[in-house]
Structures are given as C-alpha cells and as structure tokens.
Design a protein with these regions (language model features):
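Acidic-and-aromatic substrate-binding clefts and catalytic sites of carbohydrate-active enzymes
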Residues: 40-44, 131, 199-200
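Non-catalytic C-terminal interaction segments of nucleic acid-processing enzymes
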Residues: 2-15, 21-27, 35, 169-236
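A short, highly charged nucleic-acid-interacting micro-segment common to nuclease
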Residues: 28, 88-104, 108
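Active-site metal-binding core of divalent-cation-utilizing nuclease and nuclease-like domains
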Residues: 64, 94-99, 112-161, 167-174
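Nuclease-adjacent, charged terminal/linker segments that flank catalytic cores
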Residues: 1-92
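Hydrophobic, Leu/Ile/Phe/Ala-enriched alpha-helical segments that form helix-helix packing faces
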Residues: 50-53, 107-115, 182, 208-211
Length: 236
C-alpha cells in the first residue's frame, strides 16, 4: 500500500483524523482487523482508501501477508498503540487463533449493531471488568478452578454477559472447567455461546445441565449470526 501523492505522510499523532484513532484503538483491543472491518469503522470505503495507506506509511499499522481469502489483515504497531492510548500494548494473534479472532470481531460488530445500547470489551480487556472476583464464589460454593478469558464481554443494562464464539469441539472436561468458571464468577451475569456445530451446542448444554451451572448463571446457546463465520485461508 502506498499513500496518494497528494497526501503527506503522517509523522505525528496530530496528523490523524478522529476516525484513525477509532481504527487504531480497535486494532490494539482486538489485535487484528480485516480491511472490511476497518472500513466499517471509517464508515466510508473512500475514507478507508485514503487513510489506511497513510497509517501504514506512517508506521501506525502493520499489514499481514495475504492469508485469508478476499481481504488484507492489519495489526497496530507499538507506535500505533501509543497513539491509540487505550492502556494496552500492541499485539498480534497467533496463526492458530487468527481466523477465530477475526470472526470474533465480526460477532462483536454484529451484536453492537443490533444492540446499540450495549458496550463491548475484548478478551484483552475482560480482566479489567472481572478483576478481583477470582477467589469469590457464588452461593453453591463452586471453586473457580482453572482461569478463563472469554472471547469478549457484552455490557448491557448493568449486566456483564460473557461471550464465547466456538468453532472447534473441546472435551467435556474442558467445557466443564469453562462453565464452572462462569458459574462461580459473581461479576458474570450471563453467558452467550455462539456455535456453528450442533455437537458443540449439545456438549455445552449437557455440561451445564449435568453440573447445574445454568442454575447460577444464565446460559444461552445460539448459532453464528448472519455474516459471522471463520473465513477460509487463501490458497497458495
């Protein structure tokens, strides 16, 4: 990507427009965004076409190789994270988590579009919301067991809803550990599981039913919403 010759390369934070800060914050918060997700944040493909090359040339963002079909991926650099000023350092997901993490962004965007009164906290921000509750338990006396970071938190009407986007089937023991953690963490008022495999839905429902976790925290299991899917790898 190269900036148009009619635009000067940004060399300081003062060169950025307000929408650039929104893009940089979400690049830091989520770790990675696809170009179409960045376009949603600018709200205009022409603005994206003009601003994204400037962020790249200015050292605020770092493009990935073309890994997924039909889109380019970007992450924030350390310089971009400084500009974002959201209290987090720049990071990039592992290749193993990449497709999942891009799908989580699509899910977050879908939920905020359809529930505009809500706020989203990313996996990186979740501990700020639930910090201090790990050693406390609900009335049934569950021990928290292994720690867990949900894929995101939806803050709505004073409630904290943990959100999980699940594509790969885990063992029943692993689901039991995760669901036990949700049930024994007082700051979590509900859990939404979004799954694309009936086997996952059955396993999560069975674990909650057998252990009674759904008596301590509201649990819903839903299919992936429209527009949310794990994007295919780009073929060599």
């Amino acid at each position: 990507m190269h900036p148009p010759t009619s635009f000067r390369r940004p060399t300081s934070f003062q060169d950025l427009i307000p929408e650039d800060y929104l893009v940089l914050r979400d690049l830091v918060r989520f770790g990675v965004l696809a170009e179409d997700q960045i376009n949603r944040r600018y709200g205009d493909s022409i603005v994206t076409m003009l601003q994204l090359p400037l962020l790249d040339a200015g050292g605020f963002v770092e493009p990935w190789e073309f890994l997924l079909c039909g889109t380019q991926l970007f992450s924030a650099t350390a310089y971009g994270a400084r500009a974002a000023q959201c209290g987090l350092r720049a990071t990039k997901p592992s290749m193993q988590d990449l497709r999942h993490d891009i799908a989580v962004v699509d899910l977050a965007d879908y939920l905020l579009e359809h529930e505009p009164e809500a706020e989203w906290r990313t996996e990186r921000e979740a501990s700020r919301v639930i910090r201090g509750t790990v050693r406390r338990t609900r009335r049934r006396g569950f021990e928290n067991g292994p720690g867990h970071q949900p894929d995101g938190l939806l803050l709505k009407s004073g409630n904290v809803l943990a959100v999980e986007l699940e594509h790969s089937v885990k063992s029943e023991q692993r689901y039991a550990d995760i669901c036990r953690w949700f049930a024994s963490t007082p700051r979590v008022d509900g859990v939404r599981w979004y799954v694309d495999d009936p086997k996952i839905a059955d396993r999560v429902a069975r674990v909650n039913r057998q252990h009674g976790f759904d008596r301590d925290v509201d649990v819903t299991i839903e299919p992936f919403p429209p527009g949310v899917a794990l994007r295919p790898w780009r073929r060599p």
